[in-house]
């Protein structure tokens, strides 16, 4: 039975996109506390500044916003990537690998990835719990350019991952997220909506749950 809050659209290339009804499901709003800022000057090579100016113009953002994005990505993820031995893998390689993955392969990969995630969360956040685990996964997806979102419907939280890697990677993502949530909340019911490119994991965490508040 199809969830009435979900709209599944078929594209011309036969892939499907899941859309949550915006009149019912709202994007998670985090506290908009004004951050304290400082003004600082750095001396950079002229060529580097020219490239930053060009990139900011192409992205239609200010240089200040671009620099903040670069520094934020470094602080949230890049500075830890060497410590956790993170190696970038091109998307098309993952797509090709996914074609021949069996259910047994997915089980083995999930079991291999779980302790790596735990070690990474402890290394990056200083403690391993559900909030820090979710935040680390969100940091990873943002750093790698993978689309993700967190939406709230009353006490229900919808965690959306749009990977575009194919059906088997959707099955992997679904299984991994279920096992992570079950590790911390074994009694909670978890539902998933899955297409070849998107996974939506839904769990009741309460209307005040915020993965960035710890």
Task: Describe the role of every protein-language-model region.
Residues 2-46, 53-57:
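Short Lys/Arg-rich basic patches
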Residues 51, 61-84, 211-212:
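Short, basic amphipathic alpha-helical segments that act as recognition/interaction helices
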Residues 54-58, 76-108:
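Short, positively charged interaction helices/loops
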Residues 68, 134, 138, 174-182:
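Generic solvent-exposed, charged/amphipathic alpha-helical segments
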Residues 91-158:
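An N-terminal amphipathic alpha-helical segment
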Residues 149-195:
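Short, hydrophobic/π-rich interface segment
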Residues 194-212:
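C-terminal edge-of-domain segments
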């Amino acid at each position: 039975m199809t969830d009435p809050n979900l709209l599944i659209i078929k594209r011309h290339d036969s892939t499907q996109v899941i859309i949550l009804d915006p009149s019912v499901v709202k994007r998670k709003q985090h506290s908009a506390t004004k951050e304290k800022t400082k003004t600082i000057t750095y001396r950079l090579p002229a060529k580097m500044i020219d490239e930053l100016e060009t990139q900011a113009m192409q992205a239609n953002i200010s240089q200040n916003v671009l620099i903040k994005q670069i520094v934020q990505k470094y602080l949230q993820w890049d500075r830890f990537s060497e410590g956790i031995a993170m190696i970038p893998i091109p998307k098309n390689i993952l797509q090709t690998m996914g074609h021949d993955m069996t259910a047994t392969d997915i089980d083995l990969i999930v079991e291999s990835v779980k302790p790596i995630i735990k070690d990474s969360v402890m290394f990056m956040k200083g403690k391993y719990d559900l909030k820090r685990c979710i935040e680390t996964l969100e940091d990873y997806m943002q750093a790698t350019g993978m689309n993700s979102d967190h939406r709230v419907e009353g006490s229900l939280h919808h965690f959306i991952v749009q990977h575009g890697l194919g059906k088997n990677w959707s099955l992997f993502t679904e299984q991994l997220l279920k096992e992570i949530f079950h590790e911390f909340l074994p009694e909670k019911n978890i539902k998933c909506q899955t297409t070849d490119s998107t996974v939506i994991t839904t769990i009741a965490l309460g209307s005040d749950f915020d993965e960035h508040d710890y």
